[in-house]
């Protein structure tokens, strides 16, 4: 006789959709504006970092292709430049970590998000992420930064989520 037919299984239920019961989702423009505001808070450290690079490079010794020293540079100023670079980098890291982990990890908002009136919440529970979850979400942003497609994702995504939002199951909502 003929082999038995494969059993028929019911189809999978449709993917859970965001039910708009609370505040609207934040626009991509609001998210970009919040990021730019956050960067303004880091501007002094960024300037220090850039000045440090410039001073270090301009005052570094240079050699010819044969290894002959062409310009001895100014070691004192070169080290000053490297110190400024390091201080600027540490400043950017400290400001960024405080803004994202201490503020957003406790309130769902960075300085920029607060100014724009948006907040990060868990997509399913509606609660603010923990500091650890906020750290993981930020790490996902860094992993995606090589191609930046995740940052553009909200432009066509119905949930307006970035790559990191998708992985962490978060949404950014408008609160004012």
Where are the model-predicted features located?
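Short, small/hydrophobic-residue-rich motifs at membrane-helix boundaries and re-entrant hairpins
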Residues: 1-146, 162, 166-169, 173-176
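Glycine-rich flap/beta-hairpin and adjacent strands of clan AA aspartyl proteases
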Residues: 147-158
């Amino acid at each position: 006789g003929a082999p038995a037919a494969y059993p028929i299984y019911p189809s999978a239920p449709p993917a859970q959709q965001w039910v708009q019961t609370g505040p609207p989702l934040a626009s991509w423009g609001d998210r970009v504006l919040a990021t730019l505001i956050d960067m303004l808070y880091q501007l002094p450290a960024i300037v220090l970092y850039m000045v440090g690079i410039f001073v270090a490079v301009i005052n570094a010794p240079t050699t010819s292709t044969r290894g002959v020293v062409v310009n001895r540079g100014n070691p004192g100023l070169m080290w000053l430049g490297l110190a400024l670079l390091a201080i600027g980098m540490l400043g950017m890291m400290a400001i960024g970590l405080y803004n994202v982990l201490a503020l957003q990890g406790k309130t769902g908002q960075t300085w920029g998000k607060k100014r724009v009136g948006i907040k990060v919440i868990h997509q399913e529970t509606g609660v603010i992420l923990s500091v650890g979850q906020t750290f993981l979400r930020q790490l996902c942003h860094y992993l995606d930064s090589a191609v930046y497609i995740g940052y553009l994702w909200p432009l066509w995504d119905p949930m307006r989520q970035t790559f990191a939002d998708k992985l962490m199951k978060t949404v950014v909502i408008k609160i004012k």
